[in-house]
Amino acid sequence: YFTNTLVTYLPSLDETSRRRRAERPEKPQAATVDNYYLVKVDVKEANNVAGIFLPGLELAEGTKLSFLFNPQSDIFSLTCTSDYIERGNFFVSDLNVSSRNQGDSISLYLRSDDIFVGGVYMPDFSVQGGVKENQIRLATRFNNKENGAYALISTVSTLQSDPLSGIPQLRIHFYPSTFGTDKQIWALGAKEILYDSTRMVVDSFMMVSGKQRLVIDGVASHSMADTLHLRMDNFDLTPLSQITDRQGYRISGFTSGSADMAAALGRGVLYANIAFDDIRVNDIPMRNTVFRSKWDFNAQRALFELADRQQQTPIVQGYYQPSERYYR
């Protein structure tokens, strides 16, 4: 039932979806009226049980899930509420999710007071979207009143299959999107991002504010033949504080330069030359510096150096051995 329902709206999930749906017997319309099923889950003390299915998963007491569906007419409605859900570095509080299908599309609404994922804190978080004809449209926003950071990111993603390998792919395009603080606003977007299980192709992802510019372009994969390029022009590091604030570090300043990484999803061969200006960490001024990195093919490791820009003297030197995940 779930597979057939999904491929109705995302047929590229299964090349045989049309054939399989055609084989389903037709039911008289009257038979679909009362063929509803209801699944309800009300969590009491389930953390020990939840950990069996997903180690480390914690659910708040009172978490509720309700799923109403009719397998004959392919109609469903889902709601979920929870005071919190936590696992590892993922945390969400006051979660409210609702989704339903109607006609030829699925609608989705999600709201949370706080979401913390991958080191990024996003309060007052919401997602609105829909799924129709292999396309997923999402509008995602958050608003951090503590530090003034906010974002509105709108995308349309098309699910498809690679014509040669048959691997499912997601082709992402951006509507006008922004990231801002109480002092300035960055426009962000890309010509296109193509993602599958083997690689990610980025076509000119940019964050721009006036003369500031950050551009990511290229291919991230496990292959040394693919390289991801980063270029920054007088780019304000304020957006980085959205990640570092929760670790107790407020970072400001500007950076310019470039970096290239081959096999970005594999061992990661990095070449970089990036200058840092007017850097402050927790309001403490730092020296203007430059970070350089190159690959030592003989030793199969990355050499890096952080040097004083004015004196051209090294502050930190070392290397990274990808095969051992070791810094020195």
Annotate each PLM feature.
Residues 1-258, 265-328:
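Interface amphipathic segments
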